[in-house]
């Protein structure tokens, strides 16, 4: 009697099913890791195509993109260290404006570019340390602390600028008669500033990924209780994070002066919110932890800058261009967050 050979789909055992789910999760994780880079490339391509089709100057618009991405890049790369430990700070934009106002004032009094740079960085570090003390030493709620300090720093910047000149603090760096004009031609060059941003991002990436302090930051952000039980002191890590953030903010303030020459109360407007969007566009979760990435702010900053300038060129003849741009940015923000969340396995610890 002949027997029929048939293939029967046997149900997977428990271990096989878990292995299959694990492989799917790892594949999804790898794919989502490339979403920010792919998004940046696509937005850059759309930007160039739009500029060419509209007949606008590509070089000029590209320099605008770099200027926008550079300030946000310095600020957000430094802020990555704060978000990595599970904290956040909404006062960074106001912090930058205060230090820029102080730096411009000191330059007008002393005529020293190096002293202006030092004042910008030191002022930002001190203000960041103040936030760190309020957040870690006095155990104030982070949300309350950042809202309060944002108001304080905004009022302080207005006070400094209005006491010098109600229209803003003009450093006159771009004037040919200024002795520092030769240095301004270098420091104010957009490609030199981009090189400085790349150098800063690489340095932060090294600290974040290859140094013991960076790994501890991710540990604290992922599970602060376990980190404390293993002997990691969160206070020292928090202070370190806010200091690095202060350096990034100070550099952003210095190059803001180099770009704008003068500082007013509207300088750096919206940079704080752009920082948050850039970090998310770069593929990093605001909650921090093991998924934190030092390069996220750099990638996200350029994504956002390409998007902004692409929409600006596309809707240059539209009266509702600004509103449409904000709506598109919000939709993309939610889309990126959703795609990134697909790779999370909430029932297991992150590695």
PLM-predicted stretches and their roles:
Residues 111-151, 300:
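Alpha-helical transmembrane segments within multi-pass membrane transporters and channels
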Residues 42-52, 57-109, 134-139, 279-291, ...:
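Single transmembrane alpha-helix segments in multi-pass membrane proteins
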Residues 138, 142-210, 260-265, 318, ...:
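Transmembrane helix-bundle core of multi-pass membrane transporters
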Residues 53-64, 158, 162-164, 208, ...:
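Inter-helical junctions in multi-pass inner-membrane proteins, predominant
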Residues 1-46, 222-236, 307-351:
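Cytosolic-side transmembrane-helix boundaries in multi-pass membrane proteins
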Residues 112, 117, 127-131, 185-264:
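Helix-loop-helix "hairpin" substructures at the membrane interface of multi-pass membrane proteins
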Residues 260-330:
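Transmembrane alpha-helical segments in multi-pass inner-membrane proteins
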